[in-house]
Amino acid sequence: VCRFIILIDYNINIKMKKIIQFIIITLIGLIVNIHQVFADEKIKIGLIVPLSGQYKGIGNSILKATRLAINKINNSKLIIVPRDTKSDPKTTLKVSKELQEKGIKIIIGPVFNKNLVYLEELKDVTFLSLSNTNINNPGNVISGGINAISQIKAIKKFQEYNKIERSILLVPNSEFKSEIEDAVAQTKIKLKDKFIYDTDPTVLTSQIEKITRYSQRKQNLEDEIKRLENSNEVNKEKKISNLEKRDTLGGINFDSVIIADFDESLKSVATSLLYTDVSSNRVNYITLNQWFDKSILKEENLQPIYFPSINKKNYDNFVSEYFNIYNEYPNQISFLSFDLVGLVYFLIYKNDFIINNKIFYKKNKFKGKIGIFEINKNEISHILNFYVAENNSFKKIF
């Protein structure tokens, strides 16, 4: 009886071992298959830009830059799936739906803010807008551009670096005004005063005269000349001669002026400041990111003028490499799109290649060509460098 029981136990053990072996082999097979599926699965990033119509030059430059980024990353699983928005809001929604149907959850674009209007319908898709505006964006849109907050933060750092204590802020009465005001509130930058000005040049000069107390300083000069003329002071003729070479007399109650403007409007404001005898030699001229606009270097009367911006060395290298490959120069937005591809890949990698809308919620930093990206709670900001345009060149301060 004992031998019979032993044989039964032995047979049971043999069967159990075979069952366990079968289960282990099956599990290994499943794991290998699952791994193979994930290994073969493509990481698709959508790209929605204007590839036809008035702005096709911008879109095609962005597309080429993203392909350049893909080549740099050198991962065959990562692909860009582009679509033409025609710079139209309804077309933007249509092509975004097509990308969503392909299983794409992250889309770079659109370029222009007007094309964001319908995108909130696609709640499971995260859009990385190439715009630099943050206010009133749909909940699933993250601005990837060099926004006002990033720029004002850099200016605040420059204030501390240069011991600037009495800045006035000049803001144009434009759509960008609310972005600047929001950035000022969030960064808590130290300002002596803030003024909104009209972009119409015929109105602008009179506004700048009032801001700088030009009439009072002009009157001070006239009064002092008259006083000397009626006085018995020694060398009064020489003193009068020196005063007559001046435009105004009296101090300025600020040590720097932050001009939140660009291109010709920026130059108009600076010219009005010069007219009112407030030169960049008397106060610091500070402005926003000018993307190293070389026309500023020609305006010697405005120099030195300080501004936050991207990493110039990296930008110059990108422009050179882009030109060598495509035999044309890129636009500025294409440099941003190059970095956004790298940013998305970095965040997906950090999230174990799981693509969901949480990857932009976690606090992270990414060192791109532009500079350092800060990601937190579905917002992107940039740690910018600071430059001065002076003596026909752009010089890095920090």
Regions found by a protein language model. Give the residues of each.
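Classical Sec-dependent N-terminal signal peptides that target proteins to the secretory pathway
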Residues: K17-A39
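Beta-alpha junction/loop-to-helix N-cap segments that form part of ligand/metal-binding clefts
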Residues: K42, G57-I62, N75-N137, S143-I146
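Short, solvent-exposed amphipathic alpha-helices that sit
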Residues: G57-I73, T91, E175-K192, Q207
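Structural motif
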Residues: L78-Q100, Q151-A154, D200-Y214, K236-L243
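Extracytoplasmic ligand/sensor domains, especially the bilobed periplasmic-binding protein
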Residues: I106-L170, E175-A183, I189, K194
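Extracellular/periplasmic periplasmic-binding protein-like sensory domains
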Residues: I189, K210-E222, L228-E237, I252-S256, ...
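Segments of small-molecule ligand-sensing domains
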Residues: N327-F338, L343-F394
